[in-house]
């Protein structure tokens, strides 16, 4: 550089551009679906985990009904378990009836109300579970009669078949579908919270995205 040449002054705007890290592309929200039976304790724990996941990850969960009663219709099970399966028709029928009359947005709140009574409060009278849950969610008490009406079974079976056909009849609830792949579980107890729930979700997405995984 000769004495007559001036040192170039850096352009502040260029410096700013160089110092600003490249923005990461916005990722799309993942879509998940969980099939549950309110009577199933494992599905209850998995649903609590997915609720935590929704807080810490970009994911939208759709909630759908399946039925342990349908799954075990022809199974060779004990008398005590058969008695439970006979009772378990009630809650899922009521959820189907409520969703038909009031929309799918009532499925999750009704499940939450039923599950809290069955699994946390240990209420064994399912008619009571149904009546109290309908009142909590603000739905008509008359929906309770659906628990003992078979006219809702066709819709229940369709929802059940849609989930179970993705994983096979050798599994029960819960069934979780992610990005076109479905599998039993994951069953986690206790349900992880916060970032721990998010990390499990990350791992679930990883394995679900592996070709041939089931």
Tell what function each PLM region has:
Residues 41:
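Cys/His/Pro-rich metal-binding microdomains
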Residues 35, 44-130, 203, 207:
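Structural alpha/beta surface segment adjacent to cysteine/selenocysteine redox centers
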Residues 28, 36:
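Short metal-coordination and nucleic-acid-contact micro-motifs, chiefly zinc-binding Cys/His arrays
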Residues 49-51, 127-214:
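C-terminal cap of thioredoxin/glutaredoxin-like
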Residues 1-14:
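N-terminal acidic, proline/glycine-rich, low-complexity intrinsically disordered segments
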């Amino acid at each position: 550089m000769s004495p007559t040449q001036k040192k170039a002054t850096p352009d502040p705007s260029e410096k700013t551009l160089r110092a600003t890290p490249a923005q990461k592309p916005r990722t799309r929200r993942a879509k998940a679906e969980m099939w549950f039976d309110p009577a199933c304790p494992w599905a209850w724990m998995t649903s609590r985990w997915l609720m935590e996941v929704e807080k810490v990850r970009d994911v939208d969960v759709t909630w759908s009904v399946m039925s342990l009663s349908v799954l075990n219709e022809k199974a060779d099970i004990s008398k005590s378990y058969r008695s439970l399966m006979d009772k378990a028709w009630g809650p899922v029928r009521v959820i189907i009836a409520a969703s038909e009359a009031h929309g799918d947005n009532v499925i999750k709140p009704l499940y939450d109300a039923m599950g809290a009574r069955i699994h946390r409060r240990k209420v064994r009278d399912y008619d009571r579970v149904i009546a109290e849950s309908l009142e909590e969610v603000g739905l008509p008490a008359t929906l309770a009669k659906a628990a003992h009406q078979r006219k809702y079974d066709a819709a229940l079976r369709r929802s059940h078949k849609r989930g179970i056909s993705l994983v096979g009849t050798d599994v029960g609830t819960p069934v979780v579908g992610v990005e076109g792949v479905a599998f039993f579980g994951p069953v986690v107890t206790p349900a992880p919270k916060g970032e721990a729930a998010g990390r499990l979700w990350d791992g679930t997405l990883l394995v679900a995205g592996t070709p041939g995984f089931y």
